[in-house]
Every structure is written in C-alpha cells, then in structure tokens.
C-alpha cells in the first residue's frame, strides 16, 4: 500500500482539500456567485464536504489501482481534443465546472486535477516514464526560451514562445501527455494561502528553467488569464 499525503487543510500555505475564503473569511468560495451560481452547491459547507469526499475517493482509487488517468491534451472549448484552441480567459470556478463535464460515460467521473496528482505525474515522468527533467523543461515544453523549433504542422514551422493549439508538437509531450510543460498554465484544485488556487507548469511566455513542469504557484481563483 502506498501512503499518499498532502499538507494539512486549514493551514495557510499550499494544501488540499480546502476552501479559499479570503482574509475576511467571506470571499471566493464563500461568495454565492461562485459556490452556487457557477458550481451549483447549496452552501460553502456543501462545497467543502464535496471536496473532502472527492479527495478521499481519489486517494483511495490511486491506492487501489496504482494510478489515474490524465487528459492527453490541454482543455479546449470542445473538451480534451487535439488541434483545438486551449481554453483560457476563464476563472478557476468556470474551469472547475467545465472539468466535471468531460466524462465519456456515466461510469467515469472527470475532475480538475489535484495538486498531488500533478506532482505524482511529474514524479513518474522523471523517474519511471520518459525520464524527462521536470525542474528544467526547456527541452520538451513550449516556453519562451525552449530550444529549437516545434514540429511542422500544416506545412508551417512555428517557433517556441507563442501559444499553440492543443497537441501541436510531438516534442511537447511526455508519456503521451501534451503540454504538461509550458504552452498554457494549468489550474489545479490545490488551495494556497487565504486567497489562491494553484496553477502549474509554466506557459509559452515563461522561462522553462524558472517555470518548469514541476513549478506551482497560487493566484486568485477569480483571475482569468491562465
């Protein structure tokens, strides 16, 4: 049995599962516009209970089956498909809701990735998978300082350092998962401090040695530029 743990809920830094309620304890996940209007929960308490249950089920599933599935491509308006415009300019709540609609059948649930799942995926890639560097992803991600050009698509060679469609380059993948490193930031369910959710992986505008696949940071869940 593998023991999987994360930082303790109700602490002030990186942690999950937990709510983000602002320094006044009345914002973000306690704002009805978000927890009810967008996510459909009756109360912040119901939202917290759902997060706790989902997290426990995720951990139990990993321990039982030895792993989990990740969408092969970044999220687009059409879902998880190749060759689509990455879905950006949406806040955390909108993307969290979108992630719950991606299951192919009623026997499968789709969720936004948890922080621990992101870390486990990076750990697998660096140690057991294609053994790519997760602390400097300039050689396999779409960053501002990545090396060389991307693959040719539709007869045109496009350089690193600009946003591309999902699954654009065969060089930008690890274990058949595209754009874990760069292209666009990825939101997770991990909470940060009193006012943030965590995003990971860097983007096309970031240095891949400073913002690699393993990088994570907290930002306002109401922001919409990721």
Where do the language-model regions lie?
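Short aromatic-cysteine micro-motif
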Residues: 3-179
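Acidic glycine-/aspartate-rich tracts in secreted/extracellular proteins
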Residues: 74-76, 189-194, 204-205
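Disulfide-stabilized, aromatic/cysteine-rich ligand-recognition loop
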Residues: 89-103, 108-113, 171, 194-226
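Residue-level recognition of short, solvent-exposed, well-ordered loop/turn junctions
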Residues: 179-180, 225
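Active-site-proximal beta-strands of protease catalytic cores
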Residues: 182-190
């Amino acid at each position: 049995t593998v023991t999987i743990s994360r930082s303790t809920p109700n602490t002030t830094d990186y942690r999950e599962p937990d709510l983000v309620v602002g320094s006044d304890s009345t914002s973000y996940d306690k704002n009805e516009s978000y927890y009810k209007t967008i996510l459909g929960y009756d109360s912040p308490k119901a939202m917290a209970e759902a997060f706790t249950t989902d997290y426990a089920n995720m951990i139990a599933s990993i321990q039982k089956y030895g792993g989990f599935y990740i969408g092969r491509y970044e999220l687009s308006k059409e879902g998880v498909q190749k060759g689509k415009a990455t879905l950006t300019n949406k806040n955390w709540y909108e993307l969290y809701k979108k992630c719950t609609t991606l299951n192919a059948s009623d026997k499968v649930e789709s969720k936004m990735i948890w922080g621990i799942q992101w870390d486990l995926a990076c750990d697998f890639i660096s140690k057991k998978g294609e053994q790519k560097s997760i602390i400097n992803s300039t050689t396999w991600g779409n960053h501002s300082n990545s090396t060389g050009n991307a693959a040719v698509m539709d007869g045109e060679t496009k350089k690193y350092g600009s946003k591309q469609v999902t699954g654009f380059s065969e060089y930008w993948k690890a274990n058949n998962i595209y754009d874990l490193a760069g292209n666009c930031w990825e939101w997770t369910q991990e909470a940060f401090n009193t006012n943030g959710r965590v995003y990971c992986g860097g983007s096309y505008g970031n240095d891949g040695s400073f913002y690699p696949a393993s990088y994570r940071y907290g930002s306002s869940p109401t922001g919409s530029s990721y």
